[in-house]
Every structure is written in structure tokens, then in C-alpha cells.
Amino acid sequence: MEWEDEAYVLSARSHGETGAIVELLTEARGKVAAHVAGAASRRMKPFLQPGARVIVRYRAKVEGQLGSATLEPMGEGPSSLFDDRLALAGLSAAAAVAAAALPEREAHPGAFHALEALIRVLEIPEIWPAVYVRYEAGLLQELGFGLDLSKCAATGAFDDLVYVSPRTGRAVSREAGKPYHDKLLPLPPFMLSSQGGLAEGDVKAGLDITGHFLEQFVFGPLNRPLPPARLWLLDRLAEADKL
């Protein structure tokens, strides 16, 4: 079996003296792992970083078994962010969450395009943390656990939605949620609309929502915690006063 496609690198771990097992996210085939020979070379290391975009030429004797691949870089990749540690933390977290959450060899084009959209804005510090939250919400949607923020779960009202039920992932209005506000998750306005700016605490609230449902529906059933890179991102955003 052979194919060629564009992909984002999600992770790379050493295998043997000079090779690596590389996890890749493609649009048509989803998450795919492959052995890449010569990955330890100085030439290849820069485009084996999380978020690097590459052309993959993949070959396997039997479908479903670990194949081998050659990679060709597309553009400068994450190297453009090397002076921005916070953006690199966001990129590392996005790749780690996708690598841990997505099943192997199952197409999830929405996840591919969500990662693509995030990478495009990582050089804009004012907006990328909010886009990161939407990225995780998009992963939940792709995996069948999408949030329903269209109307109040209790009343059907479309206005003044300020909470999310931690049980169902559905929005709750201010009035309906008032008696239970200490048990509900605050819903930041930017998750309802791309219009308007970010208030203090909005990104933290958004990450709390997506993190809660990733733990509840994706990682919890697998007895896994959120990836360390995701937890590290929260710490780095707090240090930079971006929450």
C-alpha cells in the first residue's frame, strides 16, 4: 500500500539509532504513524517538530501495520515561532491533544482544518488563545461530543446564554442557571460569536469547558489524563496574563 498526502506532524519519538516513529495528521486518512529513517539528522530535525507541515510518501506491506515514510517540508513551519515560547506552547498542546484524542487511520478532516486554522493565527498573540479554545471544541465535535451552545437547555431561549452544563455540554441562560450557578461552567461570549473582544478570564473559562469535556468523554474512558503539554499551556498562559 502506497500513498502521498500533506500532513501535520503531531509527535516524533526516537526509534533505533537514527530513526523515529512519527505521528502525522492528514486530511484524508486521519492520524497515521510511520517509521521515518534518518530522523535524527540535522537536516530533518526542524520539520519533525509538532505542527510542521510536510508532504508524506507512505508505504506499508499490509494495511493496518506500521509503515515507513519519507517527509518533505512545506514552508518554514514552527521555526517561525521559535522566539515566541507562548505560541510554541499552544502549538505543542494542540498537537499533543490531537495525537492523544484522535483514533488511528480514521479520517477527521475537521480536525485537520481546525489545526490548520490555529497555526495560521499563532503569530497574532491577541487572538490565538481564543482560537485554541475553538480548536479543542472542534475536536470534540469531530469525535461526536460537540457542545450545543445554540440555545438554553432548560428554556429554549436563545439570548443571555452564560453557562454550560458540565453534564450535557449544553448552554444555559442566566435566569435558568441562577439557582445552580455554582454547579455550572461559565460560558465566555467569544464561544458564542467571533464578534467582540476578550475579557479577563474568558480564555480560562473556555479552556475549563473544553478541558472538562475532553476529560469526561475522550480521555476519561481511556483512563488517561489531559496531555502534559495541555496542562503546561494553561500554566504558560497564566504566567503571561493571557487567561
From Swiss-Prot:
Keyword Electron transport: no
Keywords: DNA damage, DNA recombination, DNA repair
Superkingdom: Bacteria
GO cellular component terms, semicolon-separated: bacterial nucleoid
InterPro entries: ARFGAP/RecO, DNA_rep/recomb_RecO_N, NA-bd_OB-fold, RecO, RecO_C
Gene Ontology biological-process annotations: DNA recombination; double-strand break repair
A Pfam family this chain is assigned to: RecO_C
UniProt record similarity statement: Belongs to the RecO family.
Its job: Involved in DNA repair and RecF pathway recombination.
Protein name as annotated: DNA repair protein RecO
Native source species: Caulobacter vibrioides (strain NA1000 / CB15N) (Caulobacter crescentus)
